[in-house]
Amino acid sequence: MADKEATVYIVDVGRSMGECRNGRSVTDLEWAMQYVWDRITGTVATGRKTATMGVIGLRTDETSNELEDDVHFSHIAVLSNIKQFLMPDIRKLEDELKPSKTDKGDAISAIILAIQMIITHCKKLKYRRKIALVTNGQGRMSDEDLGEIVKKVKEDNIELVVMGIDFDDPEYGYKEEDKDPRKAENETLLRTLVEDCDGVYGTFEQAVAELDIPRVKSVRSVASFKGYLQLGNPEDYDSALRIPVERYYRTYPAKPPTASSFVLRSEPEAGQEEAESSEAAAATQKGSQSGDIGLTTVRTMRTYQVEDKSAPGGKIDIERDDLAKGYEYGRTAVHISETDENITILDTFAGLELMGFIQTDRYQRYMHMSNTNIIIAQRANDKAALALSSFIHALFELECYAVARLVVKENKPPVIVLLAPSIEPDYECLLEVQLPFAEDVRTYRFPPLDKVITVSGKVVTQHRNLPNDDLLDVMGKYVNSMELVDADEDGDPVETFPIDDSYSPVLHRIDAAIRARAIHPDQPIPPPSERLTKFSHPREDLIERSQKYLEKLIEIADVKKVPPKAKGRKRTRETEKPLSGLDVDALLHHEKRAKISPNNAIPEFKQTLAQAENIEAIKDATKQMMVIVEDQIKHSLGNANYDRVIEALGTMRDELVSYEEPASYNDFLGQLKDKLLQEKLGGDRQELWWLVRRNKLGLVTQRESDQSRVTDTEAKEVSLTKMKE
């Protein structure tokens, strides 16, 4: 479970925050809110109820706080008490955080008020407490009772963060020229306060510059297995090894947030609102939390029906409890009773049993089949830690891996895992990955890359398909010129692309887009951060350095550009000339094909279309294929010819779409279905039409071809029309 958090943001909205300074095109408040919105939306995106926030407005026109009777707390407004933030709260906060008409208000008093809010909300419970002050340092600040503030912050373990606009920061290397004396005095006051509280003090130049750095989410690990690592059967042998261990993820893929479906909420009919279920009410509440009260979540309702000719409509409804579990075998649902199903379940007990050992040099890394996990000793068990440490060191010294059988939970299927020792200065563990069973391994033999073996068994090392020495030499130089590891002044290697600077573009781009839309729903989504796109293209210096080797490689390898594939009607386009410049058809004296042979229908159909000079020739070829396909169906013994028919239909569909004649295919498919419905092609052929639907060989729609007049709805109706009972 994640730690509870309570954060209070103090945002300076004084009149001076509405001005643009130091050549910026945005106001100080707009510039500062980039940081505030980034932190708030990042917390909202977690969806955790334990991640709470509050917002205080500093130097506001009005005063609204529990200490407003004290003059020191004037022009300070609590815009939101500490709570879980949702989309409506962000919308409300966006409207309230506007520059005021006054510069009165004390930032130190706002910090005192934030401390009081945290104490009231958190009480003595375990929370991660934090106060973040965002200001430009203008106006008056009181330096009274700073010692008491520091004492209270440390007592309640509150982290104090002060982010200042144009604040001097020697560590970051920023200094504002011609600084106002009062602002300089306020900066010194805030810096002293933060340093005494062991907090964080920084300038917005650094904070805004680091906003495009994706934040990697830290996740608290949860044990996926708790049991015993054992060698031998402890029930039969006293010498058996048995160590209490725990298993955690070492690596796990992060996934972007999934989409949710919403619909416009309709007004309930009379009497319907009272009968609304608790589930529907919860869904409605969730829709309102999304920030738009006009939306509600999509709710799924399933009904089960069976055919009954005596019932109205030919079907009757049944309850889910009356259904029996079945498994698909081909296109047949096979029922297995609960008694028979228990036979197929392997009775297993949770545990990690050692099966054997293997030398490290005999293991191939391509055998990995899963993410990496770690095995550590049971927590707070010194005896188990000592025993596991001895086992880890034994594997390390003998250069061995252990092979074990893992059952995570009782009656779960077992898996075979590899255990590798990992020893660091202050940390030891076993790295665990899943291995394949013998039946999972598929062995394929490929021809060698450095030689050619003829039919007679002769080995040839000089061949047109093998690279010569010159080509290998140039390729080696080209690869070396693209080396990503540079050298420093001492000649030591320096990694140009450190793995820690590599982020998932999909994950962080979606996250940034969601947060941008949450803050500014009517503005376009900003472009992706350069940190996400810099690995999508090579560096300029690498391109320049390798260009001469690339040109030499193209010359020696005799690389030629393939002509681009022409678009448009195949029948009106010129025949592509081969690179050799020779007319192959003229050399072979190919004559135009007049009739398509049923024995070689598909290749001859393609050839006929390629030689067609007008639409009539295309239609004639299509009619010939129609006759051949119908003849194959009519004379098919059962489903013997169905595969040939499906292949022919697929070829006809693709070719006629590419020749922009989808109407010919649609007409043929409509005629074919009518004949199948009337059983004119050798009796009942329902299975064939099912294959047509499964292979998505239905009508060509307008979405697939501009020449088609069939809509998606019409194509679906034709496809789903039931065959004759």
Swiss-Prot record:
Protein encoded by which gene: ku80
UniProt key word S-adenosyl-L-methionine: no
Enzyme Commission numbers on file: 3.6.4.12
Protein's UniProt keywords contain Heme: no
InterPro entries: Ku70/Ku80_beta-barrel_dom, Ku80, Ku_C_sf, Ku_N, Ku_PK_bind, SPOC-like_C_dom_sf, VWF_A, vWFA_dom_sf
Positions of region (Disordered): 259-294, 704-725
Compartments, as annotated in UniProt: Nucleus; Chromosome, Telomere
GO molecular function: ATP binding; ATP hydrolysis activity; damaged DNA binding; double-stranded DNA binding; helicase activity; telomeric DNA binding
Assembly, per entry: Heterodimer of Ku70 and Ku80.
GO biological process: DNA recombination; double-strand break repair via nonhomologous end joining; telomere maintenance
Cited Pfam families: Ku, Ku_N, Ku_PK_bind
Compositionally biased spans, kind Polar residues: 285-294
The Ku domain, residue ranges: 229-481
Keyword annotations: ATP-binding, Chromosome, DNA damage, DNA recombination, DNA repair, DNA-binding, Helicase, Hydrolase, Nucleotide-binding, Nucleus, Telomere
Function: Single-stranded DNA-dependent ATP-dependent helicase. Involved in non-homologous end joining (NHEJ) DNA double strand break repair. DNA-binding is sequence-independent but has a high affinity to nicks in double-stranded DNA and to the ends of duplex DNA. Binds to naturally occurring chromosomal ends, and therefore provides chromosomal end protection. Required also for telomere recombination to repair telomeric ends in the absence of telomerase. ku70, of the ku70/ku80 heterodimer, binds to the stem loop of tlc1, the RNA component of telomerase. Involved in telomere maintenance.
Swiss-Prot/TrEMBL catalytic activity: ATP + H2O = ADP + phosphate + H(+)
Organism: Aspergillus sojae
Tree of life domain: Eukaryota
Assigned protein family: Belongs to the ku80 family.
Name by which UniProt lists this protein: ATP-dependent DNA helicase II subunit 2
Primary residence: nucleus
Native organism taxonomy: Eukaryota, Fungi, Dikarya, Ascomycota, Pezizomycotina
A cellular-component GO term for this protein: chromosome, telomeric region
